[in-house]
């Protein structure tokens, strides 16, 4: 069951102190509470599989401290990929559908969408993906209402644009784009009637209050974001955050549980950083409310859990566990 009707769980008026109190509650109690809410809103055996295809890699003018695609981080060794052609992308999409996919996600390392040939190519990709009978999702940076309208007209299902962290910690991570810029993009997405995919990253040095503030911001959207990716920082050598220690797995489980409580109807997606979780920790995340994973050995430019390992994980969970496939990265 998935719904956002008026109920005792769905709220848009969470206070920061309320979310922090939930976050600091005993872990077993927290997981039990999150699981009860998860069962109220979702089929626990419905776990979506989604993957990202980078249609343009590297050279981004933003200075996000975690991202190897930033042109500011000169010491990062990254193979840049120029914009893929629509026929290349649609060939991969067709193979994905033949393998049972139902959603195809495309990401471009842009600061913002610019009208012109490349955006026209993305529109062509979205139309082609929809004509194949697949859902289409893109992450392209900032965009305005008119551009969101074009994507909606082309049939776009969802737009990903993460907040990254809470507003008070945001400028410690990126200074080339403001928090309000991100919120304006999300408003344009919602205004066009496109599903919102928006979450953040934990393990960047932020406080519990910063994590809570990010969730509070997401909860203010009415309705809540349809999907919320929660990423654990993957430190990449050469980036400003490249020397940070990885987040403790149980702390990541805690974040998943709080996200499920604050955003009960959203699909909570285990995203970057899942590769360092053993399968028991991943299952605990699902008990705590995660009901989507990114599938494939790479997420844009960072490593992910291998497909064979994921297949074995879900075979162990339950024969009836339903996996809604998205594109395996090429």
From Swiss-Prot:
> Which pathway does the database say it acts in?
Cofactor biosynthesis; biotin biosynthesis; biotin from 7,8-diaminononanoate: step 2/2
Question: Where, in this chain's numbering, is [4Fe-4S] cluster bound?
Answer: 60, 64, 67
- Protein known as: Biotin synthase
Q: Which SMART domains match?
A: BATS, Elp3
Annotated organism of origin: Methylocella silvestris (strain DSM 15510 / CIP 108128 / LMG 27833 / NCIMB 13906 / BL2)
Q: Which PANTHER family match?
A: BIOTIN SYNTHASE, BIOTIN SYNTHASE, MITOCHONDRIAL
Q: Which reaction does it catalyse?
A: (4R,5S)-dethiobiotin + (sulfur carrier)-SH + 2 reduced [2Fe-2S]-[ferredoxin] + 2 S-adenosyl-L-methionine = (sulfur carrier)-H + biotin + 2 5'-deoxyadenosine + 2 L-methionine + 2 oxidized [2Fe-2S]-[ferredoxin]
Coiled-coil region(s) at which residues? none
Q: Name one GO biological process term.
A: biotin biosynthetic process
- Per the record's keyword annotation, is Iron included, yes or no? yes
The residues listed in the UniProt record as binding [2Fe-2S] cluster, with positions renumbered to this chain, are 105, 137, 197, 269
> InterPro entries per the record?
Aldolase_TIM, BATS_dom, Biotin_synth/BioAB, Biotin_synthase, Elp3/MiaA/NifB-like_rSAM, rSAM
Which family is it part of? Belongs to the radical SAM superfamily. Biotin synthase family.
């Amino acid at each position: 069951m998935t719904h956002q009707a008026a109920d005792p769980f769905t709220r848009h008026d969470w206070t920061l102190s309320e979310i922090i109190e939930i976050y600091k509650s005993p872990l077993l109690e927290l997981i039990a509470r999150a699981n009860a809410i998860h069962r109220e809103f979702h089929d626990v055996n419905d776990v979506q599989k989604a993957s990202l295809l980078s249609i343009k890699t590297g050279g981004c003018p933003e200075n996000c401290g975690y991202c190897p695609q930033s042109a500011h981080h000169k010491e990062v060794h990254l193979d840049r990929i120029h914009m893929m052609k629509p026929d290349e992308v649609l060939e991969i999409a067709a193979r994905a559908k033949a393998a049972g996919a139902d959603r195809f996600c495309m990401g471009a390392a842009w600061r913002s969408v610019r009208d012109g040939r490349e955006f026209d190519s993305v529109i062509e990709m979205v139309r082609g993906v929809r004509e194949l009978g697949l859902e289409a999702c893109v992450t392209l940076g900032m965009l305005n209402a008119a551009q969101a309208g074009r994507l909606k007209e082309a049939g776009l299902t969802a737009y990903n644009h993460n907040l990254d962290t809470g507003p008070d910690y945001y400028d410690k991570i990126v200074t080339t784009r403001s928090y309000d810029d991100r919120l304006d993009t999300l408003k344009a997405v919602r205004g066009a009637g496109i599903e919102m995919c928006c979450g953040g990253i934990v393990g960047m040095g932020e406080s519990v209050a910063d994590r809570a503030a990010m969730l509070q911001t997401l909860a203010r959207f009415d309705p809540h974001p349809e999907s919320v990716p929660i990423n654990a920082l993957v430190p990449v050598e050469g980036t400003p955050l490249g020397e940070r220690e990885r987040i403790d797995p149980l702390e990541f489980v805690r974040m998943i549980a709080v996200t499920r409580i604050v955003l009960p109807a959203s699909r909570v997606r285990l995203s970057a950083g899942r590769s360092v979780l053993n399968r028991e920790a991943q299952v605990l995340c699902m008990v705590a409310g995660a009901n989507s994973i990114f599938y494939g050995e790479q997420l844009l430019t960072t490593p992910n859990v291998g497909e064979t390992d994921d297949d074995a994980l879900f075979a162990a969970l339950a024969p009836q566990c339903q996996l809604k496939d998205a594109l395996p990265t090429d």
